[in-house]
């Protein structure tokens, strides 16, 4: 840090949740002097809700974050207590790893990582006010009279609760649920960013005063119970993966030894003997179900439920409803599954997945004790709802920046999303593009066909966000191209160009790409005939005999055939497991992959049609009023973005294209005349 100006940075990141940590780390890796500010350094990267990372779509995001040099996957690999591959019986597009992390250990390892990152400073402070960059006045002064003296022209300034002023050339806000947050359990309401932590009320009011339209959103969390009061004999056990599984690509492509777990002691004694897998100790999770008595207790107390009494004003996530909402909406369903998830190796706290609630605490005790395995359960923390401010739709651009103010970036729940993974992905891109802004370089914008991160951000800027947004595989129309197994092939080359990963890792990924392509060429070129000798060799490894001539690739297309079987039968080259996986997927799904790739090429032509930033959509003749208003509000940067806006039909797109072509011809004519 500059010793003459100790409080002046290239970039300031406000908030050290999952978005803020990734943003600060990325910018610092890219050479920017970065300051990460948080209300409580002991809660940095705190997992304030569930202890899980990953799952369908979310696991895809984590693999992409890792491929781009982010931290979430690496930290999870060192701190998980269990990991599984979900949707293993389905196709590769929807398979994804999901881990249960040790919540306190995750935060500890993340903090240690950030503390040792060059160019990055961590400070504990609550930000109460933001000063926007001011150009030099006519008399050379940089700031209005009521602002602190010494703020440099073109710099942001943030003022802390202790009146300390920090300055920077760009600013990233990752405020989570803290903006004017309030927590609710029954009739109890108190100001909080999350339980036990003060809200950022002054900052929320300051953003509103700066003219940012804000909406009120809501999320919830379930009770935490004491493992010592659970009858585990009446639960169904869910074990972790029996074979090595990680989020990180690094150990596969570099041949590194997988990361050592950060915890090496014994688990809390309340848990039954954990699975001692040969590759990594893991703790099981446990499944229980609600009962008719549970449902009756909830229904009997709906008049005390803030969700139905009008106390809660914010809109909650549709796909993560509270238990009282599920019982009302799905009245015909006799039971709901609840997963009991340990929050760490050395704690007795257990997270009740699927039981988000803001019912009064006495009701929470009663309903949980109606479940046989929980007859004597004791709550360690009651569930609660949290309401908070978020930006209204249309405030951010594709590079995560404000549409109003250059150099201001937003990431995480302030943009209307929910989930650790969604926040981390946005934070990574906000940090990258804030650094690019500081360096005077164009932004990095991932397309929908390049990454789930691209789908996420594109949805945020082209769709009306009326409730907290959660990522699903169904949101990605090119999901067969965006698998967890090829995230490094899609994104690590870009990460190397940005300085987020070292050359050794990029070269290793390129070797993986080249080896996969080479093996596919070998398979396509090797012709097999249905001779007795060939069929005998195939039969020896469990492959059905041939009835006609075909290539080795054709044999591998059979659903039940694996590359290792074929290698043994045909003396094919040996390869690493991840390369074999790539070869199998390319062989089995080649036709579908080619079809999706053709569709991508068609859509890319629409994305290539740029819309000038100053384009006046209100002046478009022949456009419906609804379309005109939608385009003017969202201000899409490309024809492709415009086509994805709700309420925009093909006729509207055709009118827009004609208008752009007309403007292009006019601008070209003006250039010719001015040149003459």
Swiss-Prot record:
Its main location: cytoplasm. It is found in: Cytoplasm. FAD binds at residues 15-20. One of its GO terms (cellular component) is cytosol. The keyword Lyase does not apply. SUPFAM superfamilies: FAD/NAD(P)-binding domain. Its cofactor is FAD. NAD(+) binds at residues 316-330. GO terms for biological process: tRNA methylation; tRNA wobble uridine modification. It comes from the Bacteria. One of its GO terms (molecular function) is flavin adenine dinucleotide binding. Keywords: Cytoplasm, FAD, Flavoprotein, NAD, tRNA processing. HAMAP family: MnmG_GidA. NAD-binding protein involved in the addition of a carboxymethylaminomethyl (cmnm) group at the wobble position (U34) of certain tRNAs, forming tRNA-cmnm(5)s(2)U34. Homodimer. Heterotetramer of two MnmE and two MnmG subunits. Belongs to the MnmG family. This is tRNA uridine 5-carboxymethylaminomethyl modification enzyme MnmG. The lineage of its organism: Bacteria, Bacillati, Chloroflexota, Chloroflexia, Chloroflexales. The gene is mnmG.
């Amino acid at each position: 840090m500059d010793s003459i100006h100790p409080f002046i940075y290239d970039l300031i990141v406000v908030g050290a949740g999952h978005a803020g940590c990734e943003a600060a780390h990325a910018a610092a890796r890219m050479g920017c002097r970065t300051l990460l500010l948080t209300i409580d350094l002991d809660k940095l990267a705190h997992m304030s809700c569930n202890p899980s990372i990953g799952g369908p779509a979310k696991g895809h995001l984590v693999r992409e974050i890792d491929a781009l040099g982010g931290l979430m996957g690496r930290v999870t690999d060192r701190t998980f207590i269990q990991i599984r591959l979900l949707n293993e019986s389905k196709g590769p597009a929807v398979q994804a790893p999901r881990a249960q992390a040790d919540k306190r250990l995750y935060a500890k390892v993340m903090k240690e990582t950030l503390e040792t990152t060059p160019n990055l400073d961590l400070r504990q402070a609550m930000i109460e006010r933001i000063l926007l960059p001011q150009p030099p006045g006519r008399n050379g002064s940089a700031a209005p009279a009521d602002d602190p003296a010494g703020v440099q022209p073109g710099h942001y300034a943030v003022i802390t609760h202790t009146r300390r002023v920090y300055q920077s050339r760009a600013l990233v806000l990752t405020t989570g649920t803290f903006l004017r947050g309030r927590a609710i359990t029954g009739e109890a309401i108190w100001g909080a960013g999350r339980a036990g932590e003060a809200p950022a009320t002054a900052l929320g009011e300051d953003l509103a005063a700066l003219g940012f339209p804000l909406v009120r959103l809501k999320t919830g969390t379930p009770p935490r119970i004491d493992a010592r009061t659970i009858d585990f004999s009446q639960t169904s056990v869910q074990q972790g993966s029996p074979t090595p599984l990680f989020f990180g690509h690094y150990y596969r492509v570099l041949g590194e030894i997988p990361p050592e777990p950060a915890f090496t002691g014994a688990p809390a004694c309340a848990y039954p003997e954990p699975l001692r897998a040969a590759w990594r100790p893991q703790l099981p999770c446990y499944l229980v179900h609600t009962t008719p008595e549970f449902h009756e207790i909830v229904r009997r107390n709906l008049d005390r439920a803030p969700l139905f009494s009008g106390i809660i004003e914010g809109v909650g996530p549709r796909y993560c409803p509270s238990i009282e909402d599920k019982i009302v909406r799905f009245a015909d369903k006799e039971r709901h599954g609840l997963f009991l998830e340990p929050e760490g190796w050395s704690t007795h706290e257990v997270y009740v997945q699927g039981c988000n609630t803001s019912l009064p605490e006495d009701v929470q005790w009663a309903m949980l004790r109606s479940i046989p395995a929980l007859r004597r359960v004791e709550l360690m923390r009651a569930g609660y709802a949290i309401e908070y401010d978020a930006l209204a739709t249309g405030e951010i651009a594709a590079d995560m920046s404000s549409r109003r103010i250059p150099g201001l970036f937003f990431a995480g729940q302030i943009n209307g999303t929910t989930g650790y993974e969604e926040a981390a992905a946005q934070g990574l891109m906000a940090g990258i593009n804030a650094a690019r802004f500081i360096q005077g370089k164009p932004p990095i914008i991932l397309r929908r066909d390049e990454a789930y991160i691209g789908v996420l951000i594109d949805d945020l800027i082209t769709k009306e966000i009326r409730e907290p947004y959660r990522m699903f595989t169904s949101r990605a129309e090119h999901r067969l191209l965006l698998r967890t197994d090829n995230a490094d092939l899609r994104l690590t080359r870009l990460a190397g160009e940005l300085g987020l990963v070292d050359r050794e890792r990029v070269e290793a990924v390129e070797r993986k790409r080249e080896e996969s392509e080479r093996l596919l060429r070998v398979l396509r070129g090797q012709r097999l005939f249905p001779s007795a000798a060939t069929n005998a060799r195939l039969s020896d490894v469990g492959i059905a005999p041939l009835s006609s001539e075909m290539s080795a690739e054709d044999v591998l297309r059979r659903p039940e055939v694996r590359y290792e079987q074929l290698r043994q039968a045909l003396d094919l080259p040996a390869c690493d497991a991840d390369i074999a996986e790539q070869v199998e997927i390319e062989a089995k799904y080649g036709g579908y992959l080619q079809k999706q790739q053709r569709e991508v090429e068609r859509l890319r032509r629409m994305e290539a049609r740029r819309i000038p930033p100053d384009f006046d959509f209100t002046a478009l003749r022949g456009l419906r009023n609804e379309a005109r208003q939608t385009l003017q509000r969202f201000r899409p940067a490309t024809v492709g973005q415009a086509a994805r806006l709700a309420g925009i039909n093909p006729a509207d797109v055709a009118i827009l294209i004609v208008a752009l072509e007309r403007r292009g011809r006019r601008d070209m004519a003006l250039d010719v005349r001015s040149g003459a």
